[in-house]
Amino acid sequence: MPATNILANLFVTLYNNETRRKGECTILPTSKLGIEVLKTLQKDGYIGEFEHIDDKRGGKFKIKLLAKITKCGAISPRFKVKTDEFNNWEQQYLPAYDRGMLLVTTNQGVMSHHEATQKGIGGFLIGYVY
């Protein structure tokens, strides 16, 4: 049965494997947005190395977990957020001011809300991690 929301599937699989203390996990199917989200999570130190395996059936990710994710999830529907509105959404989804990050898709790619605030750009919220 095909996944209806590939991004939500990615976050749920990461969360389930982290809570079970697994060292690595496999996520399928893949997407370009999923690759960008994983690059952002890797850059901020939430996951280790990951590789994309093309098996001609949608592909899959093999991800090394670092046991740094307490909670993560997709935000649906994708709310449009201006630069000065990140604090309101941060209070809604994150447990503390300086803990975790919101994932934002912008015209410059997927990035954390901290990076988007520094660059002075807004975008659509796609997920949260802490």
From Swiss-Prot:
SUPFAM superfamilies, sorted: Ribosomal protein S8
GO biological-process terms attached to the record: translation
Coiled coil stretches, renumbered: none
Top-rank taxon, per record: Archaea
A GO MF term: rRNA binding
Family the entry assigns: Belongs to the universal ribosomal protein uS8 family.
Physiological role: One of the primary rRNA binding proteins, it binds directly to 16S rRNA central domain where it helps coordinate assembly of the platform of the 30S subunit.
NCBIfam families: PRK04034.1 (NF003115)
Subunit structure as annotated in this protein's UniProt entry: Part of the 30S ribosomal subunit.
Name of the protein: Small ribosomal subunit protein uS8
Organism: Nitrosopumilus maritimus (strain SCM1)
Encoding gene (name): rps8
